[in-house]
Amino acid sequence: MLAVFCFCLCSTAFSQTKEVNIEAGKLSEQITEEEQTTLTSLKITGKINGSDIQLLRKMAGKAYETNVKTNGKLSSLDLSQAQIVKGGNNYYVLKSGTSPKYYQPTEDNVIASYMFTGLTTLTTLKLPTNITKIEKFAFAGCSNLTECTIPESVTTIGDNAFAQCSKLKTIAIPSAVTSLGVAAFKGCEAVTNVTFAQGIQLGKIGKEVFSNNSSLTTITLPQSVTEIGDRAFYENYSLTSITFPSGLTSIGVSAFETCPELTTLPKFPSSLENIEDKAFLNTSVTAFTVSSANDYYTSEDGILYDIDKVSLVLYPAGRVSETLNIPETVSSIAKYAFAYAKNLKSIELPSGLTNINDSAFVFSKLTSVTTLASNLAIAKYAFSNCLNLTTVDFKGAIASIGDYAFQNDRKLSTVKFVGTSIPDFGKYVFTPKAVELKIHVPSGYVDKYKEKIEKKPAVLGSKYQVLGDITDGVLNPSFDGNVFETARYNVDGTKVTTRTKGLNIIKLSDGSVIKTFEK
């Protein structure tokens, strides 16, 4: 009886693994009906075409049609000594509307589109060593695949080729690769190591290539790379370190957005020409530094400016300081420049500032904002979702405030306008809910402000008041004998040394700012 039991075990083991040598289209002749659902390991030598791929998909849990499951259990597939050739039956059909699209190999030595997509039973896969291209969605959704070595002969990896291979642990890009498609490795959550072969001539890390990864901590980009595409490393939750190539010219939109552990960056190289919106949004970077030879950007105290310091481009969200005085040369604050600033509590905006762009301070931890600027234009969502913001003091005339500029600022209770020229308000600039908003305006201008506010409407709901209690540009001024003047500006924001006729903006030694009207 023991002998019979041992024989059964051996038979079962034999039925679960197999090695075959075949001609193209002949795999079905060497795999029995029973083996199609019991084999867990298979090695193929010889040539295979679309007909063979169709059977392999069935053995690995997926039928010819999209998302149709089978009872196949194949987990290990070795094609290292096989060759994929064109021809044979369709191995996959993608049903989209009334026009299904069929796929079969049309070239030799190519992992064609959708060839192994969705094979959730596969854990290891060895590819033919002579493969030259891996096309779109070739392995997408192989959610249990832990090991797949890309052959040295591969030159192109297509869009979403390995997307959602959520258990893949390492990615090694061969030296022959010159193109990585959109989202090629998107959602490979378990990848801890990405390497590029020495001598690789890859010029661009494409859009979303390594996005949505929760395990990768560090990456060194090859020297050949000049562009980092949009969302290339978006939502890399564990990324702490990256090395930029010396010839890098551009960093795309949201390239490193929501990389919360990214605190330090290498110096931006002299070649860098363009950093797009949200490139480092919602990171913890503490300082930006730039090569002194860069012609486009410069930095001061870890803050990134354009080369002339006319535009403030990026404020490091992880910077520890709670206050900031922006240089007088700055006339524009870029989109998302201060977004998610974690520690900044108060800011004084300079007199020469003319533009605060979209979402410039969104989700920052500001509690107060003071601006000395006249004719300032504030774009939509500029200060939205500043959940701790309580006070905004416009000490110069405001030209316009865009839609939802202070949306969802739940604690905002005080806004002061000294300008007698009423701003052009956008829709729902303010959205008071829990706290009543008090809008202070110059004496005698309550009705004019109310008219403009109500016309849009600029305030959502009725939980606000417009109060005409600012006289000569000063709200209830009071002076302490120990406080003295440290600086004075005229109505245009120009620094002056003596009293000038008209509105004077005065900075005091206690840090406060008042306004007086000199006749």
Residue ranges, per PLM feature:
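Boundary/junction segments of secreted and surface-exposed precursor proteins
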Residues: 12-31
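Bacterial Sec-dependent N-terminal signal peptides
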Residues: 1-17
